[in-house]
Amino acid sequence: EDLELDTARLDNEGGNIHSGKTLHINTPELNNQGGSIDATAHHLQSTAINNENGHLIGRESLTLTSDGEKLNNRGGQIISKGKLDITAKDTSIDSSGGYIVGKNIAADVGSVSGGKIESWEELTLRAKKAEKMESVRSGRDMKIETQDKYSMTGQYYSGGEAVIRATGGLEFAPEGKFEFNENIKVSSDAYIINRGLLSS
């Protein structure tokens, strides 16, 4: 059934929270280190989120909203088998060794560092800064926008069209691997540097 949790602090370290239907969590501070929180429709609103080695799962949808400074997803997994919406425009996400996975992903964040972002269909990522990504993949169209310079160092794959815009400069790094199956549009107000292999 539906489950609603509204509290000043939710500590689920090593614990499990499960809802067969809709789960609403509203808390300024969430500690899900090594824990698991899953629901059919998962709505999470929190200022400070620690999901280190934890699991945040939406079996049909996951909506994550944060107005905090940091989201710790080191070694963690943020997964939706349907739509994954992340709205955290001023939040720095450390996803080193972690996963952000969904059928359709729309993420609007302050910054994201490390880890893998994989969408089975559409992927839209807007960030002031993105760095040290291990892999970014979409089964269909991919759209990435960053304000700062963006060095693409990991593996990038798009099954559809790819639109990549980095206002502060864009670099395809030599250690990066880039494969885009349809049209690719790359733009920057500053510069574009290619040190890798770019193919479409």
Report the location of each language-model feature.
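Well-ordered beta-strand segments characteristic of repetitive beta-sheet solenoids
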Residues: 1-8, 21-28, 41-48, 60-67, ...
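Short, T/G/N/S-enriched strand-turn elements that build extracellular solenoid repeat scaffolds
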Residues: 11-18, 31-38, 50-57, 72-79, ...
